[in-house]
Amino acid sequence: MSAQVSLELHHRISQFLFHEASLLDDWKFRDWLAQLDEEIRYTMRTTVNAQTRDRRKGVQPPTTWIFNDTKDQLERRIARLETGMAWAEEPPSRTRHLISNCQVSETDIPNVFAVRVNYLLYRAQKERDETFYVGTRFDKVRRLEYDNWRLLERDIVLDQAVITSHNLSVLF
């Protein structure tokens, strides 16, 4: 990461991310989509445990995409949720997106900032189904006119190597 940003800018970006998280928790998916840049890359790969000796050599085992979505693909996912026919979300999940350890830095692109946060996504569904997703997110946000912001990239890294939930229909 490059140079750190001012406290004011850090605060503004953090507030944007907190607002975005609340939109997801409140199932305001269309409002959330409006926060995404047209060029959004929304990605998550499988987590693979690598041996220490391999990590020291810079060798990483191959991974598989879980998500590698564009804005159009995210819009289709949301449209499916809105139909009431997405059985993975009937009844709808109750979620809480918690983000912390927010680090913001400049990039080589004007008005684009790199953000690293740790997250905990709690998901409750039905009477007894509970899942915790924990990890790190690497986001890029773009500053527009009038201090508006758009999410340009989101790379989600799960700490869990095995996903124990029934599905991954929630948004991070």
Curated annotation (Swiss-Prot):
Single GO term (MF): 3-phenylpropionate dioxygenase activity
InterPro entries: 3PPDioc_HcaF (IPR054881), HcaF (IPR023712), NTF2-like_dom_sf (IPR032710), Rng_hydr_dOase-bsu (IPR000391)
Keyword vocabulary terms for this entry: Aromatic hydrocarbons catabolism, Dioxygenase, NAD, Oxidoreductase
Keyword presence, Oxidoreductase: yes
Pathway assigned to this chain's UniProt record: Aromatic compound metabolism; 3-phenylpropanoate degradation
SUPFAM superfamilies in alphabetical order: NTF2-like (SSF54427)
Catalysed transformations (reactions): 3-phenylpropanoate + NADH + O2 + H(+) = 3-(cis-5,6-dihydroxycyclohexa-1,3-dien-1-yl)propanoate + NAD(+); (E)-cinnamate + NADH + O2 + H(+) = (2E)-3-(cis-5,6-dihydroxycyclohexa-1,3-dien-1-yl)prop-2-enoate + NAD(+)
One Gene Ontology term from the biological process aspect of the record: 3-phenylpropionate catabolic process
The enzyme's E.C. designation: 1.14.12.19
Keyword Oxidoreductase: yes
Classification via Gene3D superfamilies: 3.10.450.50
Top-rank taxon: Bacteria
Enzyme class, first EC level, given as a word: oxidoreductase
The protein's role, per its UniProt record: Part of the multicomponent 3-phenylpropionate dioxygenase. Converts 3-phenylpropionic acid (PP) and cinnamic acid (CI) into 3-phenylpropionate-dihydrodiol (PP-dihydrodiol) and cinnamic acid-dihydrodiol (CI-dihydrodiol), respectively.
Quaternary data: This dioxygenase system consists of four proteins: the two subunits of the hydroxylase component (HcaE and HcaF), a ferredoxin (HcaC) and a ferredoxin reductase (HcaD).
Family indicated by similarity: Belongs to the bacterial ring-hydroxylating dioxygenase beta subunit family.
Name of protein: 3-phenylpropionate/cinnamic acid dioxygenase subunit beta
Organism: Shigella flexneri serotype 5b (strain 8401)
